[in-house]
Design a protein with these regions (language model features):
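N-terminal beta-strand motif that seeds the catalytic metal site of vicinal oxygen chelate
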Residues: 1-23, 50, 64-71, 122-123
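Vicinal oxygen chelate
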Residues: 1-14, 43, 56, 88-124
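Conserved short beta-strand elements that form part of the metal-binding/catalytic scaffold
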Residues: 30-66, 118-124
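Mid-chain, well-packed structural core segment of small domains
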Residues: 63-88, 92
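Amphipathic alpha-helical segments
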Residues: 18-33, 79-85
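Glycine-rich loops and low-complexity Gly/Arg-rich segments
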Residues: 37-40, 78-82, 94-97
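A generic structural signal for short, solvent-exposed coil/turn residues
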Residues: 4-6, 26, 34-36, 45-47, ...
């Protein structure tokens, strides 16, 4: 049996009514430079530590999704203020058990980007 993968994840693509505006929001959150390849398709080239994101134009209304982006941060409160200033909407705070750590639970927060895609800020 061959253990080689079928392929690799090239990028994560988010549908957007305004792909460039959404790419600019995400550039503030995770870094990178938005590049508009053609009308309705914008790619956010990541810094060396990031994942490539692309934004595909659509006229369809946003729908609930089962996929979201987790953003690793050093300081939750500082990151919270920054994503709110960039245009995110705070949804809720949750706590997760972290086996092996002195503290029993670690907080993370859920947000919506300007087009309604959910994402989380997770403490490093």
């Amino acid at each position: 049996m061959d253990d080689a993968p079928i392929g690799w994840i090239r990028e994560v693509v988010l549908n957007a009514r305004d792909p460039l505006a959404l790419a600019e929001f995400w550039a503030q959150v995770v870094g990178g430079t938005p590049t508009e390849w053609y009308d309705g398709w914008v790619t956010l080239e990541p810094p060396p530590h990031g994942q490539r994101l692309s934004f595909q134009g659509t006229d369809e209304p946003p729908v609930a999704t089962t996929v979201h982006v987790d953003v690793l941060v050093e300081d939750l409160l500082t990151a919270h203020e920054a994503v709110i200033a960039a245009g995110a909407t705070y949804v809720e705070e949750r706590w997760s058990p972290r086996p092996g750590l002195d503290r029993k639970q670690v907080p993370w927060r859920v947000y919506a980007d300007p087009e309604g895609h959910l994402f989380c800020l997770v403490v490093r």
